[in-house]
Amino acid sequence: MAHKKAGGSSRNGRDSKAKRLGIKRFGGELVSAGSILVRQRGTPFHAGENVGMGKDHTLFATATGKVSFSIRGAEKRRFVSVEEIQS
C-alpha cells in the first residue's frame, strides 16, 4: 500500500467566466427603446414605467427617454423607470 499519493493529479484549475452583470445605464442618461438598463440575477431592481423585464431578469427600456432610479413601497424596492421624452 502506497504511503504517498501519485503525483500529477491536481484537483484545482477551474473557474467560470465573468457574467458582466450590473447597471448598464445610470440615472439621467438618455436611452432609446430596447436599450439594456440592468443585467441581474433575480430582481434587486424592479421594472418601473416604460421598462420591461426579460426572462433572465434583464431590465430594458420600452420607450425613448431619461433613466431614473427610485425606492418605493413598504418593502423599499428599487425601481428603474424611463421618463418618456416627447419628440
From Swiss-Prot:
Pfam families: Ribosomal_L27 (PF01016)
Family annotation (PROSITE patterns): RIBOSOMAL_L27
SUPFAM superfamilies for this protein: Ribosomal L27 protein-like
InterPro entries recorded: Ribosomal_bL27, Ribosomal_bL27_CS
GO MF term list: structural constituent of ribosome
Record's keyword terms, sorted: Ribonucleoprotein, Ribosomal protein
A Gene Ontology term for the protein's cellular component: cytosolic large ribosomal subunit
GO annotation terms (biological process): translation
Keyword hit for Ribonucleoprotein: yes
Superkingdom assignment: Bacteria
Annotated family: Belongs to the bacterial ribosomal protein bL27 family.
NCBIfam families (alphabetical): L27
Protein name stated in the entry: Large ribosomal subunit protein bL27
Encoding gene, per UniProt annotation: rpmA
